[in-house]
Amino acid sequence: MFFNPYLSGGVTGGAVAGGRRQRSQPGSAQGSGKRPPQKQFLQIVPRGVMFDGQTGLIKHKTGRLPLMFYREIKHLLSHDMVWPCPWRETLVGRVVGPIRFHTYDQTDAVLFFDSPENVSPRYRQHLVPSGNVLRFFGATEHGYSICVNVFGQRSYFYCEYSDTDRLREVIASVGELVPEPRTPYAVSVTPATKTSIYGYGTRPVPDLQCVSISNWTMARKIGEYLLEQGFPVYEVRVDPLTRLVIDRRITTFGWCSVNRYDWRQQGRASTCDIEVDCDVSDLVAVPDDSSWPRYRCLSFDIECMSGEGGFPCAEKSDDIVIQISCVCYETGGNTAVDQGIPNGNDGRGCTSEGVIFGHSGLHLFTIGTCGQVGPDVDVYEFPSEYELLLGFMLFFQRYAPAFVTGYNINSFDLKYILTRLEYLYKVDSQRFCKLPTAQGGRFFLHSPAVGFKRQYAAAFPSASHNNPASTAATKVYIAGSVVIDMYPVCMAKTNSPNYKLNTMAELYLRQRKDDLSYKDIPRCFVANAEGRAQVGRYCLQDAVLVRDLFNTINFHYEAGAIARLAKIPLRRVIFDGQQIRIYTSLLDECACRDFILPNHYSKGTTVPETNSVAVSPNAAIISTAAVPGDAGSVAAMFQMSPPLQSAPSSQDGVSPGSGSNSSSSVGVFSVGSGSSGGVGVSNDNHGAGGTAAVSYQGATVFEPEVGYYNDPVAVFDFASLYPSIIMAHNLCYSTLLVPGGEYPVDPADVYSVTLENGVTHRFVRASVRVSVLSELLNKWVSQRRAVRECMRECQDPVRRMLLDKEQMALKVTCNAFYGFTGVVNGMMPCLPIAASITRIGRDMLERTARFIKDNFSEPCFLHNFFNQEDYVVGTREGDSEESSALPEGLETSSGGSNERRVEARVIYGDTDSVFVRFRGLTPQALVARGPSLAHYVTACLFVEPVKLEFEKVFVSLMMICKKRYIGKVEGASGLSMKGVDLVRKTACEFVKGVTRDVLSLLFEDREVSEAAVRLSRLSLDEVKKYGVPRGFWRILRRLVQARDDLYLHRVRVEDLVLSSVLSKDISLYRQSNLPHIAVIKRLAARSEELPSVGDRVFYVLTAPGVRTAPQGSSDNGDSVTAGVVSRSDAIDGTDDDADGGGVEESNRRGGEPAKKRARKPPSAVCNYEVAEDPSYVREHGVPIHADKYFEQVLKAVTNVLSPVFPGGETARKDKFLHMVLPRRLHLEPAFLPYSVKAHECC
């Protein structure tokens, strides 16, 4: 029992709580007898905190000061309080001389001349009547936090207008027309001499004016208005921070130096240890230093309790936060321990030397008293939820972390805390960051899903939800702190069936968490102080595991390397995708050449988010439309930009005029109003340089020769295909010849690319003008090569790790160029470039295939690469696939041959890879000579830097269809596969296990492999006459065993779990007959924990007739006979892939009334009707649907073995296994005592 004397308010001095005498904090307000006026606040406290074991909440309004108890000492919660736990104070004297600091975060704001900030006249002159101030947050070499306020950077863009004075008047008029709020600004217009990057031309843009505006907020509004009205404008959306970084060559993540500055001791804008003001010309970068100082990090987790017993919802006043755990640690530095690299310590990157806040860096905030949580854990006890949240925010402000991390904190923890503070307790959360609200401080979330919560609440009034937006799309902004949520990081870095913290901890840390169900948390919490300690340990371990993940994955180093390379803030690397990276890099490269980037208005698009703050929002959570073309996620960091895709056309994805039967594409792309699949652009001039329409093919593939290959198959691929095409052929905006533009005199200076539909795009060669894209890529490729060379020589693990992150940043950014030019609603689309890249890549594949066909089978050619022992001698003539192979004993052999005969043929081409089947050469020889073959092809066909590389050799390969194959790689254990059920997250483990066993038999058992080859050459009539080859019986035996396991309940529920991703709000699904949607509805009806958008929803298919929890109601207790579900003699072939349909029809005859509904056959029941939560199935012993699971087994095995099944016009490969499997009847449990065990041979 916890006696809470502060619910009634007004208790002072030595109050007794739980039998413990409370001592007042020395110098606190209690002893004075005077209390400053305090607004009333709502206290919400669980009743069990005061009366052990009791449920419910106590709500009370009080006017007393908020309190906190730390080690039996009472503390008043206020902004000027001294935090009670031990921490290393940073007492800084006056700094003299230049300051060298490392910057990790930046923000910009607009200040006015009458700003209350303590700005000296030297810098206040830049604020007449308003001006931009750029705040650089960072740390000095000695670890002190610093804020550098940079004044004097104006916002500017370019506009074509003949009269300078008249344009100034136009700007003034437009300033009165832009949307509110409108603020004062100063403007200057000067002539400029620049050349547009779009289209080849040597003449500057005529009548170009540079419009410079002191106020970035108004500059953006005016520029957008001019763009909307049709004015030719350039670089309108470039914010002042980007201008400073590019114009002054400053880094957004790295070391800088400020030589002349004013020290701020009074009237500070930030809470940093050091704050200085400087002019834009006083800030310089320190190049060639990628080291890090020591930065403070915070990992935290929250625990909530629902008043209704369901999953907590922040908007409900009874769903309170009961505990918050925090782990304080440091990252950066110059040693392995500093960087979090295991080096003789506990492997977590946190030692006693790194603890800077608290006894051990571990903190727990809890409502009520709490037992012993752990040694040296600092526990803070609060009388109510409001005081708990206020204490945590004050702790956050005092600790002032540079990096904040957690697991799913973007979409749950931070959102939950801010929602409670803002909407329930009316607390301005933005005053807890490193900048006050008036100085541009922000502490909020940006979510793209509008009205999601309201829609969800309307759909499920009895349910709650914790994530109203996709995790990857939710953006968090805290001025001076960078948020790195490890949940989307893990999703981007790993390929896992689920991304729960426990799963990631096992994968990365080899640790398992002590799980505590969200249903058990309230029971333990209200039990007593020891129960709250148990919940506290559970809460704290999550924060500790996330800290360890943070230090193991080291994503912050990757993001920092990209921020430094792309010249954008670290926050934009994490949240804003790849488009902004390429745009800023291109802007920087063009600035050196006096090129400018045009803007193009597309109706319906929104302005990309920037760092600027003019008016801080009052709400902590903001929902707006996603930014087209730049709505990114952490996953974008680790993936190559995929070829553009759109919905297939009516011609099955082949563009008009292709006229080729040997290849196809996965998508057709077009510019103009007729584009398909929702991909389109406005009818302006930025699509094709005046061309009316452009269509092109992407992700080109050669149709595979489907089948099972027991011969070696070599795979060759192009290294960095798309970047190398840009560099080799000088493709760029600046080299594109546009109608009406300049043309070279000599036709030999023009490189032409003709698409399948006859449209031709032309580019000037490098001898006329070097491509800006090509030079930028060349610089990065050379830089990456130099970094990798340094890695090979580097012995220091810290330095080597930083170099590795740098080379990875270079690789990822290079590969993003193709997507940058091809995204129609991107920042600078140019489909002629993207179409040309795709066309050239297609031609390269075709030329490679033709060269292989013409040369690789010729003895003279092979003699230059292979020795006599590399050949397979004695190949039977009957082994060719053209010959028919009957079962054993019926073949007609033509005898052997000692001729060294080699046959090479391209059997598949996929975007940048070529698969070549070799007959007559050993796999070992191909592995040894493959690089030489690739080098020879490159030398004969391509120009630098295009390079064909040897990748691997399949000893045997099952080519199923496009993008789907399985093979055994020479020199590697296991199988390499793509696009099959074994690597799909949706398939259950049982199906994967059976399929894996079948494939193991096929690739590891020589008899089975030979039987598969023979089977592929048989007709269906021959199979009916002679049966399947003997070696294939082993596969059939495994399938029979799987069938028996299912019908006799020998399979664990865990191995039968299926899953689907909840990709959007459940109310936005048009189909209600989806299994995972049905499961969510059943969970909501039972008030159970619901998945977040982006999570996988797990379910099991149960036996038909079992009454699971109905949608909108709870279980009615109907019982089902436990045992085996009856099964007909033959396996029903009904296609149950479709989740919809299958609704029973009333059995009517003429005008007769409806009779009793006919019962569906078991396999005809739709999946959504029998889908149920796995935990519910285990707890209630619900039998599984054996029919459906065995049907899935047969489909999965058919998918991987169908190339070897007999073909023909009358053969149905999907029914082949049904035909050859022996039939078996599985009895109901009541008949089992009367059955007789029999032996059956398969």
Swiss-Prot record:
EC number, UniProt record: 2.7.7.7
Reactions that this protein is recorded to catalyse: DNA(n) + a 2'-deoxyribonucleoside 5'-triphosphate = DNA(n+1) + diphosphate
One Pfam family hit: DNA_pol_B_exo1
GO BP: any one term: DNA-templated DNA replication
Record text on subunit structure and interactions: Forms a complex with the ssDNA-binding protein UL57, the DNA polymerase processivity factor UL44, and the alkaline exonuclease UL98. Interacts with the putative helicase-primase complex composed of UL70, UL102 and UL105 proteins; these interactions may coordinate leading and lagging strand DNA synthesis at the replication fork.
Low complexity bias (residue ranges): 653-665
Stretches the record annotates as Disordered: 14-38, 644-665, 877-898, 1108-1163
Keywords, sorted A to Z: DNA replication, DNA-binding, DNA-directed DNA polymerase, Host nucleus, Nucleotidyltransferase, Transferase, Viral DNA replication
Record family assignment: Belongs to the DNA polymerase type-B family.
PROSITE patterns hit by this protein: DNA_POLYMERASE_B (PS00116)
Biased composition (Basic and acidic residues): 1145-1155
Regions of compositional bias (Polar residues) in chain numbering: 1110-1119
GO cellular component, as recorded: host cell nucleus
Matches recorded under InterPro entries: DNA-dir_DNA_pol_B (IPR006172), DNA-dir_DNA_pol_B_CS (IPR017964), DNA-dir_DNA_pol_B_exonuc (IPR006133), DNA-dir_DNA_pol_B_multi_dom (IPR006134), DNA/RNA_pol_sf (IPR043502), DNA_pol_B_thumb (IPR042087), DNA_pol_palm_dom_sf (IPR023211), DNA_pol_type-B (IPR050240)
Cellular localisation: Host nucleus
GO molecular function ontology, one term from the record: nucleotide binding
Protein name: DNA polymerase catalytic subunit
Function: Replicates viral genomic DNA in the late phase of lytic infection, producing long concatemeric DNA. The replication complex is composed of six viral proteins: the DNA polymerase, processivity factor, primase, primase-associated factor, helicase, and ssDNA-binding protein.
Gene3D superfamilies hit by this protein: DNA polymerase family B, C-terminal domain, DNA Polymerase, chain B, domain 1, Helix hairpin bin, Palm domain of DNA polymerase, Ribonuclease H-like superfamily/Ribonuclease H
